[in-house]
């Protein structure tokens, strides 16, 4: 699997400056999720990878919840750029 197979939606200059920003973290978690998902399509019984995927999904969900509370406009923009569904509300 080639690491650079995913299209970058964040320009290189922004990556260098904002590695700790919520948007960058969500972006990197999304790339990891896509990589693990494609891995699990081939290796269905890789339970450690399934556990890692669930952990990363939870982290991304918490970061997205934080961003939606703090700045709804940036949240909507990020969801649109990364092509992520909005989580269901209870």
Swiss-Prot record:
Domain of life: Eukaryota
A Pfam family that the UniProt record links to this protein: Ribosomal_S15
Keywords from the UniProt entry: Chloroplast, Plastid, Ribonucleoprotein, Ribosomal protein
Primary location class: plastid
Cysteine pairings via disulfide bonds: none
CC per GO annotation: chloroplast; ribonucleoprotein complex; ribosome
GO BP terms in the entry: translation
Keyword Ribosomal protein attached: yes
UniProt-annotated location(s): Plastid, Chloroplast
PROSITE patterns from the UniProt entry: RIBOSOMAL_S15 (PS00362)
Matches recorded under PANTHER family: RIBOSOMAL PROTEIN S15, BACTERIAL AND ORGANELLAR, SMALL RIBOSOMAL SUBUNIT PROTEIN US15M
Oligomer status and interactors: Part of the 30S ribosomal subunit.
Protein name: Small ribosomal subunit protein uS15c
The organism of origin for this protein: Liriodendron tulipifera (Tuliptree)
Gene: rps15
């Amino acid at each position: 699997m080639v690491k650079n197979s995913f299209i970058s939606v964040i320009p290189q200059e922004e990556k260098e400056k904002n590695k700790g920003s919520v948007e960058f973290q969500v972006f990197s978690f999304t790339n990891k999720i896509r990589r693990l998902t494609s891995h699990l399509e081939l290796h269905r019984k890789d339970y450690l990878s399934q556990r890692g995927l669930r952990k990363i999904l939870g982290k991304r969900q918490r970061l997205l919840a934080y961003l939606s509370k703090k700045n709804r406009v940036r949240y909507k923009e990020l969801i649109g750029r990364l092509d992520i569904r909005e989580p269901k509300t209870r």
